[in-house]
Amino acid sequence: MHVTAITMEDANFPYRLGTDCAEELVARLGVRAASRYLVVCDTTVAALYGHDLVARLEKDAGPAVLLTHQVGEVHKDVTTVGALAEQALGAGADRRSVVVALGGGITGNIAGLLAALLFRGITLVHVPTTVVAMLDSVLSLKQAVNASFGKNLVGTFYQPAEVLADTAMLRTLPEREVRSGMGEVVKNALAVRPAMADRLAGLLRPDARYDDDALRWIIAESVAAKADVTGADKHERGDGLVLEYGHTAGHAIEHAARGAVAHGAGVAVGMVIAAEVSHRLGHASASFVARHRELISKAGLEDTVPACVRTDDVKNWLTYDNKRGYLDCAADTTPMVLLAGPGRPLRTGGMPLVPVPLAVLNETVDALAAPGRAGTDHRTAVPV
């Protein structure tokens, strides 16, 4: 496995990336000499990889137990974390146990918060199984779950000891989830690492079919992009906030969709909304907005608010964005990451956030509603 040293201020951990490397992955976990391996995954990943990983660990590393949670964003909450904690303690977890987060971003957050809370903190190792997790969520110290008022509002910061990524696990990933991951890749190219954009444009596939070489390049570039901004900002409260590009409207769309819209798909639309807002406010050019649409289309993602979502709901959730409080904003504004051009975030007092009038943001959301539907009519949720 290729090793990249991740440094976020005083937080350091290795990111190991390979293909068809299950034996090496288990060997790396075995080095931890855990009293018990607590493998956390959802019920789908349990059937694909969870039972096999537990069996391999039992054979070659030490005692292991599988802790499962239900699939979906609606289960990413404190209730799930509490239930898993009870299961872990009932299975004999102690301070020398290791939490293995086997899955995508939802599982990573659930398991990360679990590791931070058990005995006030035990070892956490990420084994990501989705594109979003491999190139984005496992590279953050943020471990959070949702509340009824919005996404990622309850959590803490907690460092993983290691990331072990095997691209072979992406072969079972539904096309919807692969496209979702590419939404975050496009974000990296637009907001953080514009030098990767041209090659990325040639690699992106609307059919979501990528070979291992392409995936390794995409993941490695995205890891480097995230490291560029978190190296001196481990809590992502300064320059690291640029990684929130597209997430203000993206999170609102996800929440309004009640799980029917994948994270990266929401972020993709959120980026177009942010670009259009920046253009309306006189900062971004029309050609830069078009570049957003080009890359998003090449990734097989939509660039309008999905028809399954009521725009009135999106506008409501925008007022609960988790970046509120970073800036002293008027009641009729909300803080957003906006770009003036590739890799050029607008700033307020050195921070890559600007107050955006809610009237302009809401008008843009309405303008980007999927054709043929009003903002308040009701639709059946269809996954995107």
From Swiss-Prot:
It comes from the Bacteria. The keyword Metal-binding applies. It is an enzyme of class 4 (lyase). InterPro entries: Dehydroquinate_synthase, DHQ_synth_fam, DHQS/DOIS_N, DHQS_C. Keywords: Antibiotic biosynthesis, Cobalt, Lyase, Metal-binding, NAD. Binds 1 Co(2+) ion per subunit. GO terms for biological process: antibiotic biosynthetic process; aromatic amino acid family biosynthetic process. GO terms for molecular function: 3-dehydroquinate synthase activity; metal ion binding. The active site is at residues 142, 244. NAD(+) binds at residues 42, 73-76, 105-109, 129-130, 140-142, 151-152. Its EC number is 4.2.3.124. The keyword Acetylation does not apply. It catalyses: D-glucose 6-phosphate = 2-deoxy-L-scyllo-inosose + phosphate. SUPFAM superfamilies: Dehydroquinate synthase-like. Pfam families: DHQ_synthase, DHQS_C. Its cofactor is NAD(+); Co(2+). Gene3D superfamilies: 3.40.50.1970, Dehydroquinate synthase-like - alpha domain. Pathway: Metabolic intermediate biosynthesis; 2-deoxystreptamine biosynthesis; 2-deoxystreptamine from D-glucose 6-phosphate: step 1/4; Antibiotic biosynthesis; lividomycin biosynthesis. Catalyzes the intramolecular carbocycle formation from D-glucose-6-phosphate to 2-deoxy-scyllo-inosose (DOI). Belongs to the sugar phosphate cyclases superfamily. DOI synthase family. This is 2-deoxy-scyllo-inosose synthase. It comes from Streptomyces lividus.
